[in-house]
């Protein structure tokens, strides 16, 4: 997702961070996945400061203005975040679906879309 601006990368990480926290349980595997994405975005180690400073509504606004292709890639990242800990949580799925609805991403979470989940 090299087409993303710096602010868009922070917005994506904000939404992923919200998903991580939706079940009130933060697992190491979720943090590791988030850090892996941040590394792929080539962000500095202190990226979480900016993520935490960004309001979720601002993040949604940024994401909603992206192309359909980029939005679908972001939906895939969100889905991966939901399944990464092998625990499909209702609040995480609800947040996924709400983000997709707000940002006009034509998807609903479906575990069958994630072949790595067992």
Language-model-detected regions and their locations in the chain:
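Small-residue-enriched hydrophobic alpha-helices in membranes
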Residues: 1-118
């Amino acid at each position: 997702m090299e087409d993303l601006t710096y602010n868009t990368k922070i917005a994506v990480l904000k939404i992923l961070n919200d998903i991580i926290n939706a079940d009130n349980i933060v697992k190491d595997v979720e943090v590791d996945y988030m850090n892996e994405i941040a590394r792929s975005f080539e962000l500095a180690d202190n990226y979480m400061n900016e993520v935490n400073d960004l309001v979720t509504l601002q993040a949604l606004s940024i994401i909603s203005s992206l192309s359909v292709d980029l939005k679908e890639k972001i939906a895939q990242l969100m889905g991966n975040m939901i399944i990464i800990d092998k625990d499909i949580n209702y609040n995480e799925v609800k947040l996924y679906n709400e983000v997709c609805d707000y940002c006009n991403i034509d998807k609903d979470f479906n575990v069958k879309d994630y072949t790595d989940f067992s």
